[in-house]
A protein has these predicted regions:
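Zn2+-dependent peptidoglycan hydrolase active-site motif and core
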Residues: 1-46
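A residue-level detector for short acidic-glycine micro-motifs
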Residues: 2-3, 44-47, 66-69, 84
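Short hydrophobic beta/alpha edge segments that flank linear recognition/processing sites
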Residues: 18, 59-71
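Acidic, glycine-rich catalytic/binding loops that coordinate metals and/or anionic ligands
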Residues: 20-22, 51, 56, 81-149
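Active-site lining segments that contact anionic ligands and/or coordinate catalytic metals
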Residues: 27, 37, 75-79, 93
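Active-site scaffold segments
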Residues: 30-31, 65-66, 76-83
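Short histidine-centered loop motifs in beta-beta connectors
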Residues: 38-61
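Short glycine/proline-centered loop/turn elements that form peptide/ligand docking sites
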Residues: 51-53, 69-76
Length: 149
């Protein structure tokens, strides 16, 4: 773990945050060195929920923190991306694939929900579909099989 930011407050649901600096944009977050000169950011955690420290080694399936609404965020979500340097807003984003995930739904009316502060409409996929070696598409709802510790 190369960077941990914790203790920033949650934002008001559905309201655009005011006065967020670039340093606070990711909110409570961690940056992980994933090898090969690449890094992964996990951002917008709940305050004081991060379970790792700088210098810690983590493994697949480890819980890092609780999903929240800190930083430049309108609603609770996990922001994840892979990048070329350990600086979220000053890096090149890199493509990645996920070993496997299940598509359980898709969202509708994201812009309206954000503008009006109303719940996001989710259309469930029936039956849910397993996807392998792919990147989840924008506006999809996915689940991941939890591995045993």
């Amino acid at each position: 773990m190369v960077k941990v930011v914790d203790g920033l407050p949650e934002q008001v649901l559905g309201e655009f945050p005011q006065g967020i600096s670039l340093e606070e944009a990711d909110g409570n977050s961690v940056i992980l060195d994933i090898g090969g000169g690449n890094y992964a950011t996990y951002a917008h955690f709940q305050p004081n929920s991060i379970l790792v420290n700088e210098g810690d080694r983590v493994s697949r399936g480890d819980v890092l923190a609780l999903v929240g609404n800190s930083g430049n965020s309108l609603a609770p979500h996990l922001h994840f991306h892979v990048m070329s340097v350990p600086l979220s807003l000053a890096s090149n984003g890199l493509p990645y694939v996920v070993d496997s995930f299940t598509v359980t739904g898709r969202t509708l009316g994201t812009d309206e929900a954000e503008a009006e502060g109303t719940p996001l409409k989710i259309i469930l996929v029936d039956p849910p579909g397993m996807v392998t070696e792919a990147m989840p598409l924008d506006q999809t709802v996915v689940s991941f099989e939890q591995s045993s510790p």
